[in-house]
């Protein structure tokens, strides 16, 4: 049984890294796993893709991205989030045929890597079951990766708020229609990272009739492990005598979905507390902005942390991690922090609900209530004995649910079911012809 993972990249971003780690975990578990990407950043021989080193490869990548995002230029009121129309041509189907997998596992395939019609091509020469690891909402929307308050994907997209469009027959409508046409009667199993994302998929018009099975994301608990707090703080030149409040993501202050404004309001509440002089805020994922962002507490910016070791050091240095996101498919930073024995304070919403157990391994605040978010931070930090218990429970949660071995075994079981079902169908068809 040969499995092929399709992902836009094998590193350089949370979705890409998650796909690559899953591929490596399956190899470790004895699965004949391969990976095909548009942009290859690792030197792994089990990954096929362009390294972007040669001039022609750079030109192809530039053309792909230009074609992919050209239609968006007409939408002058488009919001800042990613929108992927998936129109750039490619030769992925030819490469898939050369590898000849039994099962194809799709991951994050936007950015001009695949078009909706390509999925049907994978099953033209022989039956191959498709599994789609949902890492955001794009597979069942008209192009946005997170829908916010919009629920148009439950019927059909159009008049897209992400595009700032009032035209029903806009790019989101056309993209959604292309998906519906291409995926009609397609044999595919949907594997969302969280129960919230699974519920969204079940409610969507595109996937409501597909098999949906939640398989959580996973991390390397050997890399993301508790490090002595004093040592971690020394390595990052952080104060030893402060309660450190950590916040971070890709573009944490610019991406509205990450909830920075809620954090800012919560910290303003916290700054009025008598013990606020004990607190300091640490932010990773961005440099210190040119303009003051008024966090009301002393703040250190660590910049972009691009390796697991430095991230683990940052998590271990903190007393609490705050994840004030509005929507998260899973919330990988929360799991990474918990694996380093750092409790998490977040809103009780979307994918974060699968990992944070209120007042057991962190604090689940009322949705988008900055006052309760502030209360949660204070509650975690104000009692040393409680903080120690929360930290232990945080690590235990990850070890019991979110390890590579847990993830690999669930996917192995799913692949085996699908492969055996296909094999029995083929055997039946062959015997019927005899």
Where are these regions (language model features)?
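A short, well-ordered alpha-helix in the C-terminal region of glycosyltransferases
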Residues: 2, 372-375, 379, 386-401, ...
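Conserved donor-binding/catalytic core segment of Leloir-type glycosyltransferases
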Residues: 239-258, 264-267
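A short, active-site helix/loop in glycosyltransferases that binds the activated sugar's phosphate group
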Residues: 141-146, 166-214, 219-223, 229
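Short glycine/serine-rich donor-binding loops of glycosyltransferases
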Residues: 331-334, 352
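Short hydrophobic beta-strand element within catalytic cores of glycosyltransferases
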Residues: 343-346, 356
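Conserved acidic donor-binding segment of nucleotide-sugar-dependent glycosyltransferases
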Residues: 358-359, 363-370, 379-385
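Aromatic "clamp/platform" in nucleotide-sugar-dependent glycosyltransferases that forms part
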Residues: 326
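Nucleotide-activated donor-binding/catalytic signature segment of Leloir-type glycosyltransferases, i.e.
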Residues: 274, 278, 285-312, 317
């Amino acid at each position: 049984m040969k499995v092929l993972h399709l992902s836009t990249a094998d590193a350089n971003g949370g979705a890409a890294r998650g796909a690559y780690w899953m591929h490596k975990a399956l190899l470790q578990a004895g699965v004949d796993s391969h990976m095909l990407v548009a942009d290859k950043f690792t030197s792994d021989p089990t990954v096929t893709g362009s390294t972007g080193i040669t001039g022609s490869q750079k030109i192809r990548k530039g053309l792909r991205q230009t074609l992919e995002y050209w239609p968006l230029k007409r939408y002058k009121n488009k919001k800042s989030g990613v929108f992927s129309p998936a129109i750039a041509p490619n030769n992925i189907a030819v490469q898939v045929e050369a590898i000849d997998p039994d099962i194809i596992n799709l991951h994050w395939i936007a950015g001009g890597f695949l078009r909706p019609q390509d999925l049907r091509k994978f099953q033209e020469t022989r039956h191959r079951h498709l599994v789609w690891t949902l890492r955001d909402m794009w597979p069942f929307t008209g192009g946005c990766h997170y829908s916010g308050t919009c629920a148009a994907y439950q019927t059909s997209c159009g008049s897209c708020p992400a595009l700032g469009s009032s035209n029903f027959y806009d790019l989101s409508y056309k993209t959604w229609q292309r998906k519906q046409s291409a995926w009609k009667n397609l044999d595919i199993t949907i594997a969302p990272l969280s129960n919230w994302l699974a519920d969204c998929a079940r409610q969507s018009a595109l996937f409501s009739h597909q098999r949906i099975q939640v398989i959580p994301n996973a991390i390397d608990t050997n890399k993301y492990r508790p490090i002595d707090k004093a040592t971690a703080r020394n390595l990052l030149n952080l104060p030893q005598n402060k309660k450190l409040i950590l916040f971070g993501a890709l573009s944490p202050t610019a991406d509205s979905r990450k909830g920075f404004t809620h954090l800012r309001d919560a910290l303003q509440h916290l700054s009025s507390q008598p013990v606020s002089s004990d607190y300091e805020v640490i932010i990773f994922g961005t440099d210190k902005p040119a303009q003051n962002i008024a966090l009301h507490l002393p703040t250190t910016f660590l910049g972009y942390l691009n390796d697991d070791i430095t991230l683990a050091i940052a998590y271990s240095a903190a007393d609490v991690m705050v994840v004030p996101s509005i929507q998260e498919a899973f919330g990988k930073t929360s799991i990474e922090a918990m694996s380093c024995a750092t409790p998490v304070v977040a809103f009780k919403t979307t994918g974060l609900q699968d990992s944070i157990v209120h007042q057991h391994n962190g604090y689940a605040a009322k949705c988008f209530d900055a006052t309760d978010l502030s209360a949660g931070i204070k509650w975690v930090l104000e009692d040393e004995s409680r903080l120690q218990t929360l930290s232990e429970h945080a690590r235990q949660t990850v070890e019991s649910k979110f390890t590579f071995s847990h993830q690999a075994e669930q996917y192995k079981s799913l692949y085996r079911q699908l492969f055996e079902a296909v094999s029995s169908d083929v055997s039946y068809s062959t015997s019927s012809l005899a």
